[in-house]
């Protein structure tokens, strides 16, 4: 199937919309620590542009044969940023309530202040999921791994406690969770994992799978918040090669996806394969209103449209869009753990 045929077959099922592309953390496993947030994503999206984008997608969904799937009803806000720092956060909630959309908050927890929690509770049902990405629950370890001043640690714990009480209904239905990112011995290729260490991998990290850092910090979180869903994530990725100096998936990609055959080509994205993968089944929009390739297109190198001057139908699946996907299959996607090779 050609890329053009794929656009004809698949609708947009998911949206990643990032109205403010800045993060206050510098987590050790994230490009923000090493590269900073992309400059073109640091805008504060206006409410007018935000509503234009949302209305455009709703209109396409409700058309007889629009570009957006009939099942579309929400989005993610997660291009290495903190949606809770968006100064129009309440207006975002109001817009979603108006258009009957919901979204998921991914946060490091420090900006999840009581004021933001109260807003989430006020517009109940708009935020249908909260996942806190917290790498540790001992102050010194947390500060070192998150890149946030240790003085903020008590605020983090206080925020979580307030939120789990105020949003108890989300705790009960398991839509409010804590994700502890890290590594253990089984993360690495010599033990069957998909990672290899880079020169900047934290040398002080205890990788014992039972008593090491990840296991210990996860256990502490479970003890601090016994009624919450807490899970560890030892399977980190290198963001299509951006984190090579820290950790890399390249050897695993060569071994597991290409079968050590350099002639194999990318034919599709396996992240959401059932809806066409990220390039076809998802729409990604940054704070400048630009449509770009996917969550691993960190610097927005593969832009193909702008909601500031265009509507979705002006660029989606058009020649420039197809050319950008073709280019990505020969470049960034070859270093991505979600690529499908043939």
Where are these regions (language model features)?
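Short, well-ordered beta-to-alpha junction loops that form the rim of enzyme active sites
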Residues: 180-183, 233-236, 287, 296-297, ...
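The −1 position to Zn-ligating cysteines in a subset of zinc-ribbon hairpins
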Residues: 22, 26, 265-268, 332
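Aromatic-lined glycan-binding groove of carbohydrate-active enzymes
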Residues: 209-249, 281, 286-292
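A conserved catalytic-core signature of glycosyltransferases
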Residues: 79, 278-280, 311
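Short, small/polar residue-rich loop motifs at catalytic or cofactor-binding pockets
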Residues: 271-279
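Flexible mid-to-C-terminal extensions adjoining Fe-S/redox cofactors in radical SAM and related proteins
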Residues: 1-13, 29, 33-35, 284, ...
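N-terminal [4Fe-4S]-dependent radical SAM core
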Residues: 1-16, 63-68, 257-272, 320, ...
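Conserved glycine-rich "GG(E/T)P / GGGxP" loop and the immediately following alpha-helix
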Residues: 6, 12-232
